[in-house]
Regions:
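Residue-identity detector for glutamine
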Residues: 15, 29, 42-44, 76, ...
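Short, solvent-exposed coil/turn linker segments
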Residues: 91-92, 217-218, 260
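Long amphipathic alpha-helical segments
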Residues: 114-129, 202-209, 237-243
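Extended, charged alpha-helical coiled-coil/arm scaffolds that mediate oligomerization and mechanical coupling
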Residues: 131-223, 227
Length: 266
């Protein structure tokens, strides 16, 4: 694996460039922070990345509004990879994890058609997102498309029954007159809430298990979001400074009309 020390990155101006790139998503920020270097046997992969940056930079002016829209969605994404790993390992996700997973899927649902417009207009290749609809159907079975996460009463017949009983007790508690009656109803409500928590945990376990087969695709989509984020940042940087796609050859390195972005910005 190729490594370049921080001091070397600073000396050649690479660190200044990296600090000029503003990744929007946690996935893009990680790619910038953990910059990878291509080895000779990864030349084809590098050529593909350079091609995509060239195409995206060439359309930076024309697609400026679309880039801005994509970046807004990327900024709204949270790093849900830990929760996806837990689902893949059949651990029970909690409410917060399911809320964040649902939010991620909704952002993915919004991002996908935007990306397809960019891909088709700029001619990008080698980047694809999976359809988030099957995963969203698990976390939003009633198709409400609300931003929050809530386990619906209809999740199981028992949950519906428990919540109906809880509502009835709460109404009785509201109308109760004596302290003894209120204490009795409060104790009853505590028992019902414990049953509700137990039943909800079963539902969360089932949701996590249903997401498990989809986890790898969703993890791949997080990686693609990071690639897209980094790609856009590099394309905008290239457009700003008039960068061109380098031609990789087996001969000596030849640079023509080079500029130093750090000196340009002084």
């Amino acid at each position: 694996m190729i490594e370049i020390r921080f001091e070397e990155r600073e000396k050649i101006g690479l660190q200044y460039i990296l600090e000029s790139l503003h990744g929007c998503s946690p996935f893009g920020q990680e790619r910038i922070r953990r910059l990878r270097y291509y080895t000779p046997d990864q030349r084809q992969e590098l050529e593909l990345e350079l091609y995509n940056v060239e195409r995206a930079a060439a359309h930076a002016e024309e697609l400026k509004d679309l880039y801005d829209q994509i970046c807004v969605v990327l900024c709204q994404m949270k790093d849900i990879r830990g929760s996806l790993r837990r689902c893949r390992e059949l651990e029970v996700p909690d409410h917060v994890e399911l809320f964040e997973l649902k939010g991620y899927l909704q952002r993915l649902e919004t991002l996908r058609p935007m990306f397809e417009r960019l891909r088709d207009a700029a001619g990008l290749t080698g980047l694809e997102f999976h359809d988030p609809a099957p995963a969203l159907a698990i976390l939003d079975p009633e198709n409400t498309r609300s931003r929050g996460f809530y386990i619906p009463d209809a999740a199981t017949p028992k949950l519906r029954e428990i919540r109906a009983a809880k509502k009835q007790v709460e109404e009785q508690l509201y109308r109760a007159q004596t302290d003894a009656e209120k204490d009795n109803l409060r104790q009853k409500r505590v028992r019902i809430c414990a049953e509700e928590d137990s039943e909800e945990m079963k539902v969360r376990r089932a949701m996590g298990a249903a997401l498990a087969p989809l986890a790898d695709d969703l993890m791949a989509d997080a990686d693609t979001a990071g690639r897209l984020d980094f790609l856009i940042q590099k394309a905008l940087f290239a457009h700003r400074y008039g960068g061109v796609r380098p031609e990789i050859t087996d001969t000596a390195l030849e640079l023509t009309d080079m500029i130093n972005p750090e000196l340009c910005d002084l």
